[in-house]
Amino acid sequence: MEIEIATIGGYEEVGRQMTAVRAGDDIVIFDMGLNLSKVLVHDNVETEKMHSLDLIDMGAIPDDRVMSDLEGDVKAIVPTHGHLDHIGAISKLAHRYDAPIVGSPFTIELVKGEIESEQKFGVENDLVKMEAGGTMEIGDRCELEFVHVTHSIIDAINPVLHTPEGAVVYGLDKRMDHDPVLEDPIDMERFREIGREGEGVLCYIEDCTNAGKKGRTPSESTARRHLKDVLTSVADYDGGIVATTFSSHISRVSSLVEFAKEIGREPILLGRSMERYSGTAERMGRVNFPDDLGMFGHRKSVDRAFKRVMNEGKENFLPIVTGHQGEPQAMLTRMGRGETPYDIEDGDKIIFSASVIPEPTNKGQRYQSEQLLRMQGARIYDDIHVSGHLREEGHYQMLDALQPQHLIPAHQDMKGMAPYAKLAKSQGYKIGRDLHMTENGNTIQLVE
């Protein structure tokens, strides 16, 4: 059976992920993502109103024209998790393919939200929920399997396409967390089984984000302990404390809510994405928030919440807000500009439970946001976070578990892939033979 890989997006940058695997006449697409940095450089861009061709020209979503080079039918579109760099282009591209969108339950709920907010295209693909550990047939001879992984969002999976020639494992995105906060540990046992079943692993497509960092990525439990230590250290402060983190990071938001209660403050979730992600997780029973937890996304309701905080005393509340990357219209940035009823005063504490996404736009916007906050006298507590991506030792462990015949590095530009290439070469792989360094828009024929 012919096996061909199309590297459509995410092979020259961190963002707009999209990969297609052809096994005979059957094709599975993994991810359809957005490159947020290409959107953020433009003022007041509303992607939901834009045409896909304009977004492709901007470099914001994958250019999927290479799909015309693949001879076969798309059987499934499979987002690995709910981050926008993996699902943000589904509302723009999925309607081109007569195939269901298959994902974990939380991911599919987020995809549904993306589709409902789309104003340019009608997306009528079936939405199919499949739990980690589940399988579905792809054509007559292949099978799709979901393996549970841990990442900085709940319900992340690594999909595996089992073919007669061996398994193709799509390894984006994960960290090797054996002590997570809300979920089960990563299913390394299943990865080891896949590496030793049948024909083994034909190809492993891997996220290289942190491949150049030594050691292993700490557990979310480590970030939780750090966060508790910081909040406990400021528990006696009688002014404002504000926290910000990734809205999609339900485990971190849950910890912030819990620790706010422990230091005698009422947590409030503020911002559209904060309300969307946490509200979805709560409705699905994936997180247990206090019954009285307020979530406010619309501008007027947010302002009413801030007025209540100011009237009843900032010392009684912990607003948990959007804006950890310094996004211009996010809540924390607006607070820094003085555009909300919340007054930041000298000595108030701002807790960033997030790292800066390593893109120039994000770095610049985060710097500007911090400077605005400091100008008002705020004290910044930074980088209370652990990454959602494997470091060097995690990559060694995955290679040992899967023992793949071929490797394709992804989720970086060529410079960012170099550390992974060096790591792979130390394990006996060779560029041009079984280590495939590639770019967007290419195809790789693994089996002819």
UniProtKB/Swiss-Prot annotation:
Record-level GO cellular component terms: cytoplasm
Cellular localization per UniProt: Cytoplasm
Binding site for Zn(2+) 1: H81, H83, H151, D173
SMART domains on file: Lactamase_B (SM00849)
Biological processes annotated in GO: RNA catabolic process
Annotated residues for binding of Zn(2+) 2: D85, H86, D173, H411
Top-level taxon in the UniProt lineage: Archaea
Cofactor: Zn(2+)
Enzyme Commission number, as recorded: 3.1.-.-
Pfam families: Lactamase_B, RNase_J_b_CASP
Keywords annotated in UniProt: Cytoplasm, Exonuclease, Hydrolase, Metal-binding, Nuclease, RNA-binding, Zinc
Residues noted as binding substrate in the record, renumbered to the chain: H385, V386, S387, G388, H389
Cofactor annotation remark: Binds 2 Zn(2+) ions per subunit. It is not clear if Zn(2+) or Mg(2+) is physiologically important.
Disulfide linkage: none
Similarity-based family: Belongs to the metallo-beta-lactamase superfamily. RNA-metabolizing metallo-beta-lactamase-like family. Archaeal RNase J subfamily.
Function text: An RNase that has 5'-3' exonuclease activity. May be involved in RNA degradation.
NCBIfam families the record matches: MG423 (TIGR00649)
HAMAP family: RNase_J_arch
PANTHER family (UniProt xref): RIBONUCLEASE J
Oligomer and partners: Homodimer.
Identification of the protein by name: Ribonuclease J
Organism field: Halobacterium salinarum (strain ATCC 700922 / JCM 11081 / NRC-1)
